[in-house]
């Protein structure tokens, strides 16, 4: 990724090898502008191995969190969003079709437990960029489930090792995206799977 793995992307013009350029045929310029952040969510979902019928929680309903919601749903998962902003939760349920939006605050953990008969979620994604939220997210992972940290923070995060082992969790870090993820996003756009309302 230019600007991540190799410096020199903050310039008006640059040359790159042809194989690294993705043709955005069949998508609008507005759609093409969304490909990068959608690819980050698609990459996280691919790394998680989300399967049809699984219960997914996405903590953080910003652009990358919404991308994870979209691609988890495309794999057949039932998605719940957790965020502190009601307007974002309303958008996720209305425009993205997620099963539920839960507002961060007193009683949120009880609401999440109620949605899963107390088992919590097969896969939890954190897209908050907040160390406290990242630490709290471990509580929402079902036995045998996975916790995917999309966010990167310049801080240490801690968790209870006995609880982590008791639940036999899998912890996954997800960073950026690959060429395959960009192709996945472009195919989803061409197939009409990315809601137009996302481009606001």
Regions found by a protein language model. Name each.
Residues 22, 80, 146-148, 172:
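Structural detector of well-ordered beta-strand residues that form the stable sheet scaffold
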Residues 85, 153, 177:
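Residues in the short beta-alpha loop(s) of Rossmann-like NAD(P)-binding domains
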Residues 172-175, 187-200:
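Glycine- and charged-residue-rich phosphate/anionic-cofactor binding loop of Rossmann-like
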Residues 48, 90-170:
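Glycine-rich cofactor phosphate-binding loops and adjacent beta1-alpha1 units
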Residues 1-21:
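Glycine-rich phosphate/adenylate-binding loop and adjacent beta-alpha elements
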Residues 11, 53, 98, 120-121, ...:
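Local beta-strand N-terminus motif with an aromatic residue
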Residues 13, 33, 57-61, 81-82, ...:
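Glycine- and other small-residue-rich loops at beta-strand/loop junctions that grip anionic moieties
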Residues 27-106:
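Mid-domain Rossmann-like dinucleotide-binding core that forms the NAD(H)/NADP(H) cofactor-binding site
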């Amino acid at each position: 990724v230019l600007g991540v793995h190799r410096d020199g992307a903050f310039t008006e013009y640059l040359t790159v090898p042809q194989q690294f350029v993705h043709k955005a045929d069949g998508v609008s310029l507005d759609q093409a502008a969304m490909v990068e952040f959608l690819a980050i969510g698609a990459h996280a979902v691919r790394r998680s191995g989300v399967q049809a019928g699984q219960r997914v929680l996405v903590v953080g309903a910003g652009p990358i969190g919404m991308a994870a919601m979209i691609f988890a749903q495309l794999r057949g998962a039932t998605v719940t969003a957790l965020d502190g902003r009601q307007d974002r939760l309303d958008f996720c349920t209305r425009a993205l079709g997620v099963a539920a939006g839960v507002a961060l605050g007193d009683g949120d953990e009880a609401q999440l437990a109620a949605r899963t008969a107390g088992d919590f979620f097969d896969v939890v994604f954190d897209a908050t960029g907040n160390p406290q939220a990242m630490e709290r997210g471990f509580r929402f992972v079902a036995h045998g489930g996975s916790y995917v940290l999309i966010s990167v923070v310049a801080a240490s995060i801690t968790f209870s090792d006995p609880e982590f082992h008791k639940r036999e969790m899998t912890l996954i870090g997800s960073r950026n995206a690959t060429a395959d993820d960009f192709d996945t996003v472009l195919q989803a756009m061409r197939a009409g799977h990315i809601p137009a309302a996302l481009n606001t």
